[in-house]
């Protein structure tokens, strides 16, 4: 990647907090500029140098800052409404951690839906394949 991007994170619950704490956005050429939440105890604080603002400030923040990417970690009940705010205010791409598929038909917005269940199912499949290989090998060795 030959240029960096500025991003915001919406939803500083378990997944959002874990991403902020453990994922190196900078190593991927992304500056996490701000995070947004509705929880009063988080608003106005900073986490790892990232200010946490009220979700009510999201639209104004996007209008006044050059932000290309959004990391979406909100409950599925509000995901569509938050996505609408993001897409109407200049966000070019969404990294979606909600537990619903986000699609933007006829939209230039890029959406990467992250599915933890798909990853777990893939792992389960590969473990099953490996166990089948071990069983077949053990059966051959018994003969």
Residue ranges and their predicted role:
Residues 1, 27-29, 64, 88:
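Alpha-helix termination/capping residues and helix-transition junctions
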Residues 20-22, 47, 82:
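A short secondary-structure junction signal
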Residues 42-45:
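A glycine-biased structural micro-motif
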Residues 49-141:
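Phosphate-bearing ligand-interacting subdomains
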């Amino acid at each position: 990647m030959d240029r960096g991007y500025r991003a915001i994170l919406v939803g500083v619950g378990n997944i959002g907090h874990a991403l902020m704490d453990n994922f190196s956005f900078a190593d991927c050429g992304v500056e996490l500029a701000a995070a947004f939440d509705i929880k009063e105890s988080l608003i106005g604080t900073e986490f790892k140098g990232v200010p946490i603002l009220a979700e009510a400030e999201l639209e104004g923040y996007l209008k006044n800052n050059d932000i290309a990417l959004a990391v979406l970690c909100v409950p599925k009940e509000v995901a569509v409404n938050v996505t609408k705010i993001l897409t109407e205010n200049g966000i070019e791409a969404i990294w979606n951690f909600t537990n619903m598929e986000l699609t933007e038909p006829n939209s230039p917005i890029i959406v990467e839906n992250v599915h933890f269940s798909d990853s777990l199912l893939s792992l389960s499949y590969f473990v099953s394949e490996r166990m089948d290989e071990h069983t077949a090998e053990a059966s051959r060795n018994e003969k």
